[in-house]
């Protein structure tokens, strides 16, 4: 489809709020304290599709062994490292047996709402955890391309229901309750203003009668 700029596969989108988690320790010593981190799984095109920028190192490559990891800046700080290049090639230990090599550092991004603190995030490329297809669509072809994607999906998977969602819509869900509260507050404010106006009108009428 000409309207699609890039396609990626992943366990979820960057700000879905739905993540696995685990504990990783830096180095091979048993004395290294593990860091609790959220886990995301994605392919190499994930970073381009969602606009995630690398701080150091590289993204995943076809020849990787699936043991390579990319961490965010917050994870880097939790590991006690301040230079992004310093962690490249270092082993991260999962449990007591599994070793993984850090090949890249990605700039911090919000995986939840802006009310949540930035959290440590570790990213791997294991395909068995891919649940979501992400597509970056050219804005000027948005409507036509979206319709074509749904038609293609329905023709390929006739027994499945197309469940597509724009990225900004998924982010907006974080603030749905706040928007409802804001609308309620506006209603109360309007009511309060109206009551105040009625009160002023009544006072003015009373003063007019007294005169």
Regions found by a protein language model. Name each.
Residues 198-211:
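Intracellular coupling helices
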């Amino acid at each position: 489809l000409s309207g699609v700029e890039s396609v990626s596969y992943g366990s979820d989108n960057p700000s879905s709020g739905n993540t696995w988690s685990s504990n990783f320790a830096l180095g091979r010593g048993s004395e290294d304290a593990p860091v609790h981190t959220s886990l995301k799984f994605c392919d190499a095109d994930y970073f381009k599709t969602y606009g995630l920028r690398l701080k150091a190192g590289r993204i995943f490559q076809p020849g990787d062994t699936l043991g390579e990891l990319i961490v965010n800046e917050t994870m880097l700080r939790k590991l006690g490292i301040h230079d992004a290049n310093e962690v490249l090639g270092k082993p991260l230990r999962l449990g007591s047996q599994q070793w993984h090599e850090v090949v890249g550092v990605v700039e911090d991004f919000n995986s939840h709402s802006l009310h949540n603190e930035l959290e440590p995030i570790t990213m791997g490329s294991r395909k068995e955890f891919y649940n979501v297809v992400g597509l970056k669509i050219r804005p000027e072809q948005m409507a036509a391309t979206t319709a074509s994607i749904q038609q293609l999906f329905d023709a390929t998977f006739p027994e499945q229901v197309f469940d597509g969602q724009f990225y900004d819509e998924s982010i907006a869900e974080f603030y749905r309750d706040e928007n409802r509260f804001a609308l309620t507050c506006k209603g109360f404010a309007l009511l309060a203003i109206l009551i105040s106006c009625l009160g002023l009108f009544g006072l003015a009428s009373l003063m007019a009668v007294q005169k």
